[in-house]
């Protein structure tokens, strides 16, 4: 979740969304950015319904993911909505076309999740990427000047067909030139948090649930 004094934006809404949000103040969600529509990234979307107390929630996704969401949650997009369903306004977004949510200026970029193009998001000097395996050279133009990187790093080994492993994530962090890098989307085989952090270079660490990063 990206949060300022006046704006709150989710990046993806996984199955544990409700559990995570029980620990946070109950306030308006100004938007949900969807990287892609695999269940581990959108499986908690129905649980945004309490936040519709504050009004309709804007969800931003590319054309493919928007279509997937309509199939997964058809009851949210019918002409006559059943009382109590999540009130979602689905916005189709395009890579490299800036979108603005209140004071946040957000640049979607394309990364590859194996053969599936998905979205990453640049917000100021923060870059958030998940489920990436490769990135096109042309995308690097849109991520110059990044200071803080959040990126997936599944495990040390073996290699994986659709996710970065640690060595690849470290290479990408060096290419980006971020001063701080946080690894996320980690599998159970990675190892213990403190032990892994001791193996990582300066400026790189594993992220954890509930962590706050200021940039």
Language-model-derived ranges and their functions:
Residues 1-129, 138, 195-215:
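Binuclear metal-dependent hydrolase catalytic cores
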Residues 135-215:
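Cap/insert and terminal regions of metallo-dependent hydrolase folds
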């Amino acid at each position: 979740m990206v949060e300022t004094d006046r704006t709150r934006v989710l990046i993806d809404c996984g199955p544990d969304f409700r559990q995570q949000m029980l620990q946070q103040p109950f306030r308006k969600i100004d938007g949900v950015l969807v990287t892609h529509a695999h269940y581990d990234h959108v499986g908690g979307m129905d649980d945004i319904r309490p936040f519709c107390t504050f009004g309709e929630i804007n969800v931003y996704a590319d054309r493919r993911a928007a279509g997937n969401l309509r199939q997964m949650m058809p009851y949210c997009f019918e002409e006559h909505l059943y009382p109590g369903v999540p009130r979602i306004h689905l916005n189709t977004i395009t890579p490299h076309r800036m979108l603005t949510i209140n004071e946040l200026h957000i640049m979607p970029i394309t990364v590859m999740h194996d053969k599936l193009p998905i979205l990453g998001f640049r917000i100021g000097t923060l870059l958030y990427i998940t489920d990436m395996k490769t990135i096109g050279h042309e995308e690097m133009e849109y991520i110059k000047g990044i200071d803080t990187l959040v990126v997936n790093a599944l495990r040390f080994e073996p290699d994986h067909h659709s996710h970065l492993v640690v060595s690849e994530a470290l290479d990408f962090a060096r290419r980006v030139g971020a001063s701080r890098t946080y690894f996320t989307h980690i599998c159970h085989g990675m190892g213990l948090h403190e032990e892994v952090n001791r193996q990582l270079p300066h400026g790189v660490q594993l992220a954890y649930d509930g962590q706050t990063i200021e940039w």
